[in-house]
Amino acid sequence: MASLKEVKTRINSVKSTRKITSAMKMVASAKLHKAQGAIENMLPYERKLNKILTNFLSADLPVESPYIKAREVKRVAIVAFSSNTSLCGAFNANVIKMLLQTVGEFRTLGQDNILIFPVGKKVDEAVKRLGFEPQETSPTLSDKPSYQEASELAHRLMEMYVSGEIDRVELIYHHFKSMGVQILLRETYLPIDLTRVVDEEEKQKEEEVQGGEIANDYIIEPSAEELIANLIPTVLSQKLFTAAVDSNASEHAARTLAMQVATDNANELIQDLTKQYNKSRQQAITNELLDIVGGSMQ
């Protein structure tokens, strides 16, 4: 049995750890609240963009764009979102696992034809361990997502796709649903699937109270071609920003939950060690009393 001093030292050590995990939980919770605010502010804009595109497509107007043309995949780009720091449960491990599966599916293309854009230090480190050369991305897009940085990466991917440098772009990120639920997603970013955008908008319409419907016989100025040329890149930039914000909120939610579990475990361990300390102390006192009584009887 451990000595009283050893048990006391362990109790103090666990209490110190509990202070750290409790503080990290509060910090992560505050950051999560901020990230949720960013999502709430972003959603109306995203829905409006999708609604404009949906209304445009429902008018049966011709849609021509280099971003919707699918072709044989000879070179692929993968954009994976992780965190810059650890202590967030299985958040990063799940992203890396999904990345490994995705890379495995495209192995036949050859390593030189798989371009990985890591957003976050943890996935960047994993890419290097896999033997790939990570493509450069913004170092702050993971922990402080901004539309400007997301738009720059989106336009870079669009330029590579239009030029034929890559034939497909996939995203791997966590979608934030709630404090306890973050869904790992793998989605095709390019070529853009306009029918999916329409389906998402239709689902949103079903959840809303139906008002007056807008007629589909649009008069478009200056032209439908120019509208599409500007609208689809905007939708793609917004999509990448949405993934970054979703991933950021999911990270903080995962860290808040992980630190809560760590704090609860520390509390349980302190209780067990305190019981052990009291039991050892009681045993020591009993032994001393027996020694005193035994000595007086001699």
Swiss-Prot record:
<keyword id="KW-0066">ATP synthesis</keyword>
<protein>
    <recommendedName>
        <fullName>ATP synthase gamma chain</fullName>
    </recommendedName>
</protein>
<keyword id="KW-0375">Hydrogen ion transport</keyword>
<keyword id="KW-0813">Transport</keyword>
<comment type="subunit">
    <text>F-type ATPases have 2 components, CF(1) - the catalytic core - and CF(0) - the membrane proton channel. CF(1) has five subunits: alpha(3), beta(3), gamma(1), delta(1), epsilon(1). CF(0) has three main subunits: a, b and c.</text>
</comment>
<dbReference type="Pfam" id="PF00231">
    <property type="entry name" value="ATP-synt"/>
</dbReference>
<dbReference type="GO" id="GO:0042777">
    <property type="term" value="P:proton motive force-driven plasma membrane ATP synthesis"/>
</dbReference>
<dbReference type="GO" id="GO:0005886">
    <property type="term" value="C:plasma membrane"/>
</dbReference>
<dbReference type="InterPro" id="IPR000131">
    <property type="entry name" value="ATP_synth_F1_gsu"/>
</dbReference>
<keyword id="KW-0997">Cell inner membrane</keyword>
<comment type="similarity">
    <text>Belongs to the ATPase gamma chain family.</text>
</comment>
<keyword id="KW-1003">Cell membrane</keyword>
<keyword id="KW-0406">Ion transport</keyword>
<dbReference type="GO" id="GO:0045259">
    <property type="term" value="C:proton-transporting ATP synthase complex"/>
</dbReference>
<dbReference type="GO" id="GO:0046933">
    <property type="term" value="F:proton-transporting ATP synthase activity, rotational mechanism"/>
</dbReference>
<dbReference type="InterPro" id="IPR035968">
    <property type="entry name" value="ATP_synth_F1_ATPase_gsu"/>
</dbReference>
<keyword id="KW-0139">CF(1)</keyword>
<dbReference type="GO" id="GO:0005524">
    <property type="term" value="F:ATP binding"/>
</dbReference>
<comment type="function">
    <text>Produces ATP from ADP in the presence of a proton gradient across the membrane. The gamma chain is believed to be important in regulating ATPase activity and the flow of protons through the CF(0) complex.</text>
</comment>
<dbReference type="GO" id="GO:0015986">
    <property type="term" value="P:proton motive force-driven ATP synthesis"/>
</dbReference>
<keyword id="KW-0472">Membrane</keyword>
